[in-house]
Structures are given as structure tokens and as C-alpha cells.
């Protein structure tokens, strides 16, 4: 039984090591009325509507004191940020948390009932792959 337990622990540790550089999943959700931002998954920030997204911030790294964000601005609503819509956050960035917040701002659609100059915010949660969390939980359960 002890051998089996140790073997399970080694397999779990190997799984943790393998998945430590896995891609993080981004989801964008915005329920503000009049906004063209919609729910998006699989790191597709451009699902926040290519013609309407003004700017967004993405976690670039951690400087030891906090998270470093990179801001992409698309004031002309030209959709030029589309090529920057997929990101991989490697574990070697030494970000101590498994989820962090990124902002996503958009202007309302032209046929909405909100003021044309108003803007609404979205929250993007970047969460570590669930398989990695499962492996970590399994490791904790073994000890």
C-alpha cells in the first residue's frame, strides 16, 4: 500500500511538472447593457467584438512586487489587436497566483439605448488549467 501511495505521489508530481507551463484559459464576460462585449473562452479576446473594443490589459509578467500588465489600445476600432488575441502565460514568469484580473473596455453599440460616449468594463479571468489544479489537489490528498 505504501509503495502504491508513493507511486501515485510520483506520478502526480510528474503531472504537475508537465503541466506547469500549460496555457492559461481566458474568459471574457460582460453583462453591462449596451456593450458589444460578449462571453469568450479559449483565449479569444477578439470575441469581445473587433469593431468595438477600445483597449485591454494582459498580464505580461510579475516583477516580484506585483503583476506587470501590457496594454493594447485600439482607439480607432480598426481591429488591429486581433493578432494579439491569444496568449500563453508560462510558469517561469513566477506569478504566485493561479488567477488574475485583466480589464477589457468597450464602447456600446450604436443602436443601444445607452449614451454613445459611455463605456463599459469587462473582467477577464485567467485561470490555471483545471487539470493542474486537480493534480495539485490529488497530491494534497495523498499527504
UniProtKB/Swiss-Prot annotation:
A lipid is attached at residue 118 (GPI-like-anchor amidated serine). Disruption phenotype: Membranes isolated from axenically grown null cells have no detectable F-actin binding activity. Disulfide bond(s) stabilize the native, actin-binding conformation of ponticulin. Glycans are attached at residue 111. One of its GO terms (biological process) is sorocarp development. It is found in: Cell membrane. Residues 1-22 form the signal peptide. Keywords: Actin-binding, Cell membrane, Disulfide bond, Glycoprotein, GPI-anchor, Lipoprotein, Membrane, Signal, Transmembrane, Transmembrane beta strand. One of its GO terms (cellular component) is Golgi-associated vesicle. Its main location: membrane. It comes from the Eukaryota. GO terms for molecular function: actin filament binding; carbohydrate binding; cytoskeletal protein-membrane anchor activity. Residues 119-143 form a propeptide. It is a multi-pass membrane protein; Lipid-anchor; GPI-anchor. Monomer. Binds F-actin and nucleates actin assembly. Major high affinity link between the plasma membrane and the cortical actin network. Belongs to the ponticulin family. This is Ponticulin. The lineage of its organism: Eukaryota, Amoebozoa, Evosea, Eumycetozoa, Dictyostelia. The gene is ponA.
Amino acid at each position: 500500500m505504501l509503495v502504491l501511495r508513493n507511486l501515485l505521489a510520483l506520478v502526480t508530481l510528474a503531472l504537475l511538472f508537465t503541466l506547469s507551463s500549460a496555457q492559461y484559459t481566458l474568459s471574457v464576460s460582460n453583462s453591462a447593457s449596451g456593450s458589444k462585449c460578449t462571453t469568450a473562452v479559449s483565449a479569444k479576446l477578439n470575441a469581445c467584438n473587433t469593431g468595438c473594443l477600445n483597449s485591454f490589459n494582459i498580464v505580461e509578467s510579475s516583477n516580484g512586487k506585483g503583476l506587470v500588465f501590457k496594454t493594447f489600445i485600439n482607439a480607432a476600432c480598426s481591429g488591429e489587436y486581433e493578432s494579439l488575441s491569444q496568449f500563453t502565460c508560462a510558469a517561469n514568469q513566477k506569478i504566485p497566483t493561479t488567477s488574475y484580473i485583466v480589464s477589457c473596455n468597450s464602447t456600446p453599440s450604436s443602436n443601444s439605448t445607452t449614451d454613445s460616449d459611455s463605456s463599459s468594463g469587462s473582467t477577464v479571468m485567467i485561470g490555471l488549467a483545471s487539470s493542474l489544479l486537480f493534480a495539485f489537489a490529488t497530491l494534497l490528498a495523498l499527504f
